[in-house]
């Protein structure tokens, strides 16, 4: 009898976490609309959204955050897929090489920021090496990569973390397709490159799109790297939201929640797009499975 309740018991932790998440999300949404009874704010309004979207500094922060997220996600996908292609066409998708590539995935972002500062700052290893070799006269002549408004330091840190993620996310599917349909195209006369570009890569586009959405959403809402490596102005949206949240005037809280609301809206759009990609993948797999079963019956 107890065996019937085991599946439901296993769902309890997920249900608890789901309730906490939904409660927090609902609280954030209501506060972003100006409903905080403890502060004497009881009427919902879009005033806070309108005010933050009309402030030039916040608009710059939104543009900066989108720029960091889009650039890092795009470059990570392009470089990651390119490395996947090299590994797959050389049939080197397992072994020590892949383990080394996957190592950055488990490294915390704070540690990555420390690495980047020690290597790419004007007092870092690279600046010292170039100065010692005579390429630059002084360490201060080294190009300013960190804390600049172009966000190069933040993007480099994201690339170091996210390129291995793209490889890990895509390479299994790419290797499987290239080993079956890609080889079939080669046997029919296509070159290895043409087979990859015309057969393997198009069939991986949904997995590649999914990896882009995951990286974009994470980079948009991440706090550590923009804080440690980014400029003081414009600030990334998560930093700006935290600054507003800890403001001494508690009536400033709705502004922080409105900024979080913008991040949430963009993230939800990405989540819906990701769900649609996964749904299409499932439909394709089901059709292939049904077709295979039909052929076997014949």
How does the language model describe each region?
Residues 34, 171-181, 254-298:
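C-terminal transmembrane helix and the adjacent membrane-cytosol boundary/short C-terminal tail
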Residues 1-2, 27, 71-102, 114-118, ...:
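Transmembrane-helix boundary motif in ABC transporter permease subunits
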Residues 24-34, 166-169, 207-240:
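Non-cytoplasmic
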Residues 11-22, 103, 107, 156, ...:
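Transmembrane alpha-helices
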Residues 2-6, 49-57, 227-276:
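Interhelical loop and adjacent transmembrane-helix boundary motif
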Residues 113-159, 229-233:
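Membrane-interfacial helix termini and adjacent extracytoplasmic/periplasmic loops
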Residues 140-186:
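Membrane-cytosol interface at the C-terminal ends of specific transmembrane alpha-helices
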Residues 20-56, 133, 230-232:
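Short membrane-interfacial helix/loop motifs at transmembrane-helix boundaries
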């Amino acid at each position: 009898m107890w065996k019937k309740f085991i599946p439901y018991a296993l769902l309890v932790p997920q249900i608890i976490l789901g309730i906490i998440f939904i409660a927090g999300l609902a609280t954030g949404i209501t506060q972003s609309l100006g409903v905080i009874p403890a502060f004497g704010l009881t009427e919902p309004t879009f005033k806070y959204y309108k005010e933050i979207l009309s402030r030039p500094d916040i608009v710059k922060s939104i543009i900066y955050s989108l720029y960091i997220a889009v650039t890092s996600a795009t470059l990570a996908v392009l470089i990651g897929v390119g490395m996947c292609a090299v590994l797959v066409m050389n049939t080197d998708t397992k072994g020590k090489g892949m383990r080394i590539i996957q190592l950055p995935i488990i490294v915390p972002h704070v540690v990555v920021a420390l690495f980047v500062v020690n290597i790419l700052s004007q007092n870092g290893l690279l600046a010292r090496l170039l100065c010692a070799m005579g390429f630059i006269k002084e360490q201060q002549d080294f190009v300013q990569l960190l804390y600049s408004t172009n966000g190069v330091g933040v993007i480099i840190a994201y690339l170091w973390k996210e390129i291995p993620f793209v490889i890990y996310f895509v390479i299994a599917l790419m290797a499987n397709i290239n080993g079956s349909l890609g080889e079939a195209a080669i046997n029919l006369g296509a070159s290895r490159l043409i087979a990859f570009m015309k057969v393997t890569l198009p069939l991986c586009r949904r997995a590649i799109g999914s990896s882009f959405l995951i990286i974009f959403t994470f980079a948009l809402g991440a706090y550590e790297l923009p804080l440690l490596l980014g400029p003081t102005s414009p600030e990334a949206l998560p930093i700006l939201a935290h600054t507003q949240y800890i403001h001494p005037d508690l009536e400033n809280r709705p502004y922080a929640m409105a900024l979080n609301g913008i991040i949430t809206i963009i993230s939800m759009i990405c989540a819906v797009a990701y769900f649609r990609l996964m749904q299409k993948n499932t439909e394709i797999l089901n059709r292939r499975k049904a077709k295979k079963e039909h052929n076997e019956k014949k």
